[in-house]
């Protein structure tokens, strides 16, 4: 057995640790370093060389109690985490250690969290829609199977609830595996999600990885890679179509910014790290469809101060196939999910992929909503009566469309009092087609609110 490469802790600045090794024995960048003495058990990752014999590392755990002079051992490899079916139904931290109190994981395979993205010859273009059962998404900004989707929104507009609904729908309707990665979000939400999944039985097909708000920046920066590594194994070795949820990708950037400052790098625009685009690219390029399987990724993106031009959301935009924008203006109207039908976009809303009928209905719906938006100023100043008959009709149809875009969620039944609905794409298209063709003109607006299919609207209207 080779002798251990042992170093000594020489400096500690918060989560950043400088470790001195013998000359010629410096560990490689990204190697995991273990510090295990005097009741301290820390794993750190090598980030940079600061001299001929010293490496600067970022700790994945709290550095409380760490002292200069403590021994540190180079493991000779990056952080490795368990993969395979054994991780389903369990909760892990960034190091792949179970944190759900259910004992050890019986995994036989462990993989490093730092890996190359699949080569161009292994990748597969995506032209298939993933049916989510959520009307506003399936109609106006459909998700591509194996695509990357961004959920954009400020604080408290419903990003996490939408993610929970997607996990529930994919597990129960498609029977696929999901990996949920909680990056720098509230522990309470993680606990809610865990309890929700146990109650609904979804947990059996999901692995959860958490590096929450109270964790050091090193943990929050790497936890996304831990979840991604588990998802990659399902794709590459088991040939699965996997769903990878990242809540919240902004916190990954934020943690990178903290680490960058601690490492002494000069900040870039708005104080972000100069390596922002590189770090984001390294993570996003691994999320892709290959000839073996696919990873469809849904990433919640917190938008600081609702400013979409901030470098963090702006860098994320470049990697996405679809964007689901959640709007505070729609929340104020009491319409949930608060997806903005005009701001949300998708690369697969294309005649060649979704077909003529879907494309035509979607564009007509957006056209009516856009015209209604333009008319709102006139209505505010002159009143509804000053509009032409044609414009009045557009306003009435637009208001029905807005209400029909709302939908009761399974995971929010306790809050809304409405039973959750999963709506097939064909029913969604049929419903909106009837509204835009004028077949629903004599039905009151209230019948459309929180309805599933158009048939339910007819039933409600009869009782009114």
Swiss-Prot record:
It is an enzyme of class 7 (translocase). ATP binds at residues 153-160. Belongs to the ATPase alpha/beta chains family. SUPFAM superfamilies: C-terminal domain of alpha and beta subunits of F1 ATP synthase, N-terminal domain of alpha and beta subunits of F1 ATP synthase, P-loop containing nucleoside triphosphate hydrolases. It comes from Acetivibrio thermocellus (strain ATCC 27405 / DSM 1237 / JCM 9322 / NBRC 103400 / NCIMB 10682 / NRRL B-4536 / VPI 7372). Produces ATP from ADP in the presence of a proton gradient across the membrane. The catalytic sites are hosted primarily by the beta subunits. Its main location: membrane. It is found in: Cell membrane. Its EC number is 7.1.2.2. The gene is atpD. The keyword Signal does not apply. It is a peripheral membrane protein. InterPro entries: AAA+_ATPase, ATP-synt_VA_C, ATP_synth_F1_bsu, ATPase_a/bsu_AS, ATPase_alpha/beta_chains, ATPase_F1/V1/A1_a/bsu_N, ATPase_F1/V1/A1_a/bsu_N_sf, ATPase_F1/V1/A1_a/bsu_nucl-bd. It catalyses: ATP + H2O + 4 H(+)(in) = ADP + phosphate + 5 H(+)(out). One of its GO terms (molecular function) is ATP binding. This is ATP synthase subunit beta.
């Amino acid at each position: 057995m080779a002798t251990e490469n042992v170093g000594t802790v020489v400096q500690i600045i918060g989560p950043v640790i400088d470790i001195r090794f013998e000359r010629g024995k410096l560990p490689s960048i990204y190697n995991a370093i273990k510090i295990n003495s005097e009741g301290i058990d820390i794993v750190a990752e090598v980030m940079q060389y600061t001299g001929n014999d010293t490496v600067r590392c970022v700790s994945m755990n709290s550095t409380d109690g760490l002292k200069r002079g403590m021994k540190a051992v180079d493991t000779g490899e990056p952080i490795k985490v368990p993969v395979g079916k054994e991780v389903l139904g369990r909760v892990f931290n960034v190091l792949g250690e179970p944190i759900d109190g259910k004992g050890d994981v019986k995994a036989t395979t462990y993989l490093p969290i730092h890996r190359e993205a699949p080569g161009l010859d292994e990748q597969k273009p995506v032209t298939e829609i993933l049916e989510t059962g959520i009307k506003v998404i399936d109609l106006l900004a459909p998700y591509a199977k194996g695509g990357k989707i961004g959920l954009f929104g400020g604080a408290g507009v419903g990003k996490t609830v939408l993610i929970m609904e997607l996990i529930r729908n994919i597990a129960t309707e498609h029977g696929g595996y999901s990996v949920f990665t909680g990056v720098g979000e509230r522990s309470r939400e993680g606990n809610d999600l865990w309890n929700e999944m146990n109650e609904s039985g979804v947990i059996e097909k999901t692995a959860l990885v958490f590096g929450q708000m109270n964790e050091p920046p090193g943990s929050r920066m790497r936890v996304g890679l831990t979840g991604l590594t588990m998802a990659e194994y399902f794709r590459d070795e088991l040939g699965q179509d996997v769903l990878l949820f990242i809540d919240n990708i902004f916190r990954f950037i934020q943690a990178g910014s903290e680490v960058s400052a601690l490492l002494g790098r000069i900040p870039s625009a708005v104080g972000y790290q100069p390596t922002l685009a590189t770090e984001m690219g390294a993570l996003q390029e691994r999320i892709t469809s290959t000839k073996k399987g696919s990873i469809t990724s849904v990433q919640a993106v917190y938008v600081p101060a609702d400013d979409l031009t901030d470098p963090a959301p702006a860098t994320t935009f470049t990697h996405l196939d679809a964007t689901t924008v959640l709007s505070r203006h729609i929340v104020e109207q009491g319409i949930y999910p608060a997806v903005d039908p005009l701001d949300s976009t998708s690369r697969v809303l294309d005649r060649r992929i979704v077909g003529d009928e879907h494309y035509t209905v979607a564009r007509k719906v957006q056209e009516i909503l856009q015209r209604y938006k333009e008319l709102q100023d006139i209505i505010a100043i002159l009143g509804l009566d000053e509009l032409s008959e044609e414009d009045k009709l557009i306003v009435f149809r637009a208001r029905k469309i807005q209400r029909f875009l709302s939908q009761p969620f399974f995971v929010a039944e306790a809050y809304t009092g409405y039973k959750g609905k999963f709506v097939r794409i064909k029913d969604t298209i049929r419903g909106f087609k009837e509204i835009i063709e004028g077949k629903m003109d004599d039905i009151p607006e209230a019948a459309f609110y929180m309805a599933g299919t158009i048939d339910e609207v007819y039933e409600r209207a009869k009782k009114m």
